[in-house]
């Protein structure tokens, strides 16, 4: 079975399962989907698409990778974050082919508007120390966002992976500058990747 055909088959099965089990609430980057609609700049449709795409891409890719593991004894690790239909891919896989496959799965989503593939080709497991450091770094960054006047922290998604902090959100240029400055000067942050979408305020 070809990779493309396999991906489509798995995606259909995942969607069917999701439909049978109902919607599952998720918390990504510290903001509950559906719980902050009053201040969320995403439409309700985009919020729903984000949740469904994260689940479907992760399940489809993980199922294929585990069935076609290129490195014996190595379990691929994937994280999928979708914000306003912009998809961020993180994790570790064994080969470039596997990395490209995950990206193909993400780009096959009809609602996806952009895909950022930061998956690493590194067939070795992350250590507990790596995970703890990333978690602590994300927590510190989220805390610093509370001190930015005029910026609502729940409009900013923060994800740290292997020492790199990824920042997403629908923000004005002024908000983007303030958030970037705050994140990049937070103690312990090694590298910052900004994936903003620009919000234009109506006159």
List each language-model region with its residue ranges.
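N-terminal targeting leaders
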Residues: 2-6, 15, 22-203
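Short, intrinsically disordered, charge-biased short linear motifs at domain edges
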Residues: 9
């Amino acid at each position: 079975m070809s990779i493309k055909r396999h991906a489509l088959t798995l995606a259909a099965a995942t969607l069917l399962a999701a439909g049978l089990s109902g919607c599952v609430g998720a918390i990504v980057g510290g903001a509950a989907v559906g719980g902050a609609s009053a201040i969320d700049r995403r439409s309700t449709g985009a919020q729903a698409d984000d949740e469904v795409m994260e689940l479907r891409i992760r399940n489809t890719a993980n199922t294929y990778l585990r069935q076609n593991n290129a490195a014996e004894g190595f379990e691929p690790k994937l994280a999928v974050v979708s914000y306003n239909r912009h998809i961020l891919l993180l994790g570790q896989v064994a080969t470039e082919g596997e990395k490209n496959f995950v990206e193909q799965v993400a780009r096959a989503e009809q609602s996806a508007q952009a895909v950022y593939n930061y998956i690493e080709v590194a067939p070795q497991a992350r250590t507990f120390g790596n995970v703890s450091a990333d978690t602590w770094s994300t927590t510190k960054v989220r805390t610093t966002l509370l001190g930015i006047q005029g910026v609502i922290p729940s409009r900013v998604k923060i994800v740290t992976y292997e020492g790199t902090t990824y920042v997403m959100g629908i923000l004005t240029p002024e908000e983007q500058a303030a958030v970037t400055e705050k994140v990049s000067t937070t103690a312990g942050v090694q590298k910052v990747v900004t994936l903003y979408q620009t919000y234009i305020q109506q006159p």
